[in-house]
Amino acid sequence: MSRFPGLVLAFLAAAFLAAASPAAATGEIESLITDADRERLANYETTRERASEEARAGGSPQDRATFDQVVAPEPMSWSDFDMTGEWQCRTIKAGGLAQLVVYGWFKCRVTDDGSGWTLEKLTGSQRTKGRFFTDSDTRLTYLGSYAVNDDPFPPYGSGPETDQAGYAFRAGANWWRIEFPSPKRESKLDILELKR
């Protein structure tokens, strides 16, 4: 008879620990992420290092300075950050054919539908739309879709031509970025920088 309360307490403790674990926080992503994107993210560090080497070996001095400024900050905690609202955003392509290209600023928006943040790049010829998932206190995972011009966004999981995956890092009070390893087009690493 005395074992019953002990079992209940053990069960409740296990349930609490499971709910608090990072795996529980990112459980939803495991049912969504494609195998190809899982592999891209698994190779993120190596891809980023190679792309950074190529970027620093090419591109204009101004673009190299911009690249270093964007990737240099240590990631900050997302816990006290409200991402919702309007943002300026620009793409930086590192590694690959052109080695380094920094594009101009466009408009992005982040909304919160109650189940999490959703990003949409509103202007420019190459756009993205997707959701964020907690990976750690200082890193979010982004899963989204790519569209050109005014084409509609296909749902995530439609295939490697349009699926996108990356890691988001906060760099300041109103400054963050998403790094996309091994994008489908043109580069080894795409960075979407966002400021307001």
Regions found by a protein language model. Name each.
Residues 64-69, 157-168, 172-196:
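Edge beta-strand at a domain terminus
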Residues 122-129, 145-150, 180-187:
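Short, solvent-exposed aromatic-acidic interface loops
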Residues 8-19:
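Bacterial N-terminal signal peptides
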Residues 78-141:
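Mid-length scaffold segments of soluble, non-membrane domains
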Residues 25-30, 134-148, 188-196:
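A short, hydrophobic/aromatic-rich structural module that often spans a beta strand
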Residues 96-106, 141-167:
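An anionic, turn-rich surface loop/hairpin at beta-sheet edges
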Residues 4, 24-82:
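Amphipathic/hydrophobic helical signal segments and adjacent flexible N-terminal regions
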